[in-house]
Amino acid sequence: MPAKEIAFHQPAREAILRGVQTLAEAVAVTLGPKGRNVVIEKSYGAPTITKDGVTVAKEIELESKFENMGAQMVKEVASQTSDKAGDGTTTATVLARSIYEEGLKLVAAGHNPMDLKRGIDRAVEVVVAHLKSLSTPTKGKDDIAQVGTISANGDTTIGNIIAEAMEKVGKEGVITVEEAKGLETTLDVVEGMQFDRGYSSPYFVTNPDRMEAALEDPYVLVTEKKITAMADLVPVLEQVARSGKPLLIIAEEVEGEALATLVVNKLRGTLHVCAVKAPGFGDRRKEMLKDIATLTGGTVVAEELGIKLEQLGLKDLGRAKRITVDKDNTTIVDGEGKKADIEARIKVIRGQIEESTSEYDREKLQERLAKLVGGVAVINVGAATETEMKEKKARVEDALHATRAAVEEGIVPGGGVAYLRSLADLQKLDVGQGDQRFGVQIVVKALEWPARRIAENAGWDGPVVVNKILEGKGAFGFNAATDTFEDLTKAGVIDPTKVSRTALQNAASVASLLLTTEAMVADKPKKKAAAGGGAGAGMGGGMDDMDY
């Protein structure tokens, strides 16, 4: 085990402070509508230009190991806030820095760090309760567009596209962000359930121009087994042929004699049919097939349930208004499953999402939920250069997370005003005469910083702006985009409650932990081995100028 370097007491905390200040300052320059960009060098390709706090934080690594520990802890604040709320990373970083700086002064003056931590925790509880009381639900498309615009650094196009996407696919719908081929940022919406499996044979195509099979008012046969023998299918095919309706077969595989017979019947016009491979793999495939069966009102044909293909009747098949199949995707629109069954299935999936510990599983469950509930929207981000594309795509993703947070917990006035309005509640908080009251004062000072920093980044005097906001009431605050004092809610300067809450909770949690730190342990830097004896002594002087 390598030797360790250990720092104690005040020197340890001061090293943490230097790391916290370095990272926080790099991130804080991006705060607000007039925040500046940060250019980040990449080991290959063009540098990244960003105004996203968490992107800046993730790139920072300091040379001093003790200072780096402080920076990494604040980086954790930004990452956690981004993961939980999708935005507010810069605010969280500014709050964490202020709480730690103010707390450190008090610890140096001899106050008890544990009592300070308790005071900070009590104050945060009061502020969170105030934010919830201040919160109002989003009222339709305009509120969502405003939240998206602010999170996308004032880009109204992004805000409007996200609002439109949410309106079309609903709160539970999946909205994905992809890179467009052109310069325009556009929205594509897929109605109904779509899965990434196309037709088993191009002979099933009904529209040669678009190379897709369109089935109007079809029956849907769902099975998790492989179909190779035609004999299994004959009874159900005869019933479907008599009904005159098209048929979509979703199976693990349709091959051999069965596929050949289906193709021949399709070409002769005897049967309007299309076969596709079942989506997913393993257990996920079984669940997706159950989703399709529930949506269309059919039954999954599974040997373990004692259901066989040859025993199927029309009542066991699903129905849909329209199904389109191309070489890559199948889309089922208006499945005719019972509403109660679909809602029960949705409830089961929601329960699984809450219990899931895996990010990947949760994402897949969320996709399944969206497909059952009503659709998928794709925002195609367009830009002139790759650098601009990356920056714009990151802003769209941030804005998307922020709008979801707004829909979930509502909105509060932006610009740091919601925090300032909670100061009155903190002044009434009684924690006795001990050091806890100083912990409350730490939070009081920290809550002024988001509004102060937004004003400073816009070229105003921060403390003067904060005092003027405190003289007002309700949503009255400083709109840095227009350099005016006004009702921020009416001006569309709003923040998701979840973002404001999460930023404060994460900042206070990490900063108060750092305050109670008394020792730091890090690996000692290894001494670089001295250059070899005289190995290069006889070489020509020109070697000295070479780069290694």
UniProtKB/Swiss-Prot annotation:
The entry's ATP-binding residues are 30-33, 51, 87-91, 415, 479-481, 495
Keywords (A to Z) from UniProt: ATP-binding, Chaperone, Cytoplasm, Isomerase, Nucleotide-binding
For this UniProt entry, the molecular function terms from Gene Ontology, in alphabetical order, are:
ATP binding; ATP-dependent protein folding chaperone; isomerase activity; unfolded protein binding
Protein name as it appears in the record: Chaperonin GroEL 1
Q: Which residues cross the membrane?
A: none
The gene name on file is: groEL1
**A Pfam family matched in the record:** Cpn60_TCP1
- Protein EC: 5.6.1.7
Which chemical reaction does it catalyze? ATP + H2O + a folded polypeptide = ADP + phosphate + an unfolded polypeptide
- Which branch of life, at top level? Bacteria
Per the record, what is one GO cellular component?
A: cytoplasm
Gene Ontology process terms (BP): protein refolding
Enzyme class, broadest EC rank: isomerase
Q: What does this protein do?
A: Together with its co-chaperonin GroES, plays an essential role in assisting protein folding. The GroEL-GroES system forms a nano-cage that allows encapsulation of the non-native substrate proteins and provides a physical environment optimized to promote and accelerate protein folding.
Stated family: Belongs to the chaperonin (HSP60) family.
